[in-house]
């Protein structure tokens, strides 16, 4: 499941690698993003919850009944598992840069941009332009107005989307093994925010895998690097090994 504003094409090589490892891999675009963008975003009435309740749910139904269903979620993609049609059927989930977006989960320096971004900047720009110009501001692709506004509102709630939507019971249905990658140079998913997400999946079998670029001989990884092919022999192999082991357990 993709991150906010990131098209499925970004994950194509990682998905192909998983297919080489004998997984059936499906990628998709949320409405308003990538190949699911249809016309002027200013006419879109999409909300962020629709990305999970409608788009991810459609991908889920497309896969049909399978003995082992695993999810790889990047950022928002790992936050939304409790909104899937039957979250109790997830066998395992691998999360990359996924976090609770509540602004206070950031360290002091991070709060200096998270608070104004989520309380003022993002809502104001989305309302003024009728969409959020993420492509011009370095935040992936442009976002529909409703997506940007709902995302900002979740970031102002102490329990993020789970509290804002009142879906605690649905998230308690996630019993899967979950591995969350907390990457030391990821400014969009600091460790505290990653661990706060674990609290939103109270019945999951959660583990946090902390990774520093130096550990794998890299200069940087950041929020988006995990899915780069240069990490095929390190992060990709390790994550696929974990998914295989999780499916067997």
Q: Where are the regions a protein language model picked out?
A:
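Active-site glycine-rich loops that stabilize anionic/oxyanionic intermediates
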Residues: 2-7
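Active-site nucleophile elbow and catalytic-triad environment of alpha/beta-hydrolase enzymes
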Residues: 154-170, 176
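Alpha/beta-hydrolase active-site loop
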Residues: 45-64
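Conserved alpha/beta-hydrolase
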Residues: 8-40
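Short beta-strand/loop motif that positions the catalytic acidic residue
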Residues: 174, 180-182
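Catalytic active-site module of serine/aspartate enzymes centered on a nucleophile-bearing elbow/loop
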Residues: 211-249
């Amino acid at each position: 499941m993709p991150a906010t504003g990131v098209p499925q094409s970004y994950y194509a090589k990682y998905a192909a690698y998983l297919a080489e490892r004998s997984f059936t891999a499906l990628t998709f675009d949320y409405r308003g993003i990538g190949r699911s963008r249809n016309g002027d975003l200013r006419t879109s009435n999409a909300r962020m919850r629709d990305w999970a309740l409608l788009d991810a749910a459609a991908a889920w139904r497309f896969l049909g009944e399978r003995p082992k269903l695993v999810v790889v979620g990047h950022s928002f993609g790992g936050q939304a598992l409790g909104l899937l049609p039957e979250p109790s059927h997830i066998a395992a989930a691998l999360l990359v840069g996924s976090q609770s977006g509540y602004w206070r989960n950031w360290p002091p320096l991070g709060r200096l941009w998270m608070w104004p971004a989520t309380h003022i900047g993002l809502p104001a720009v989305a309302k003024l332009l009728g969409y959020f110009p993420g492509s011009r501001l370095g935040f992936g692709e442009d976002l529909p107005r409703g997506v940007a506004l709902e995302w900002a509102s979740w970031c102002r709630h102490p329990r993020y989307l789970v509290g804002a939507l009142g879906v605690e019971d649905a998230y308690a249905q996630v019993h899967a093994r979950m591995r969350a990658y907390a990457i030391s140079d990821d400014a969009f998913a600091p460790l505290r925010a990653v661990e706060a997400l674990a609290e939103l999946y109270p019945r999951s079998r959660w583990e946090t895998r902390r990774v520093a670029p130096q550990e794998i001989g890299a200069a940087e990884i950041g929020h988006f690097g995990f899915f780069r092919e240069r990490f095929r022999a390190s992060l990709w192999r390790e994550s696929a090994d974990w998914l295989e082991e999780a499916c067997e357990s």
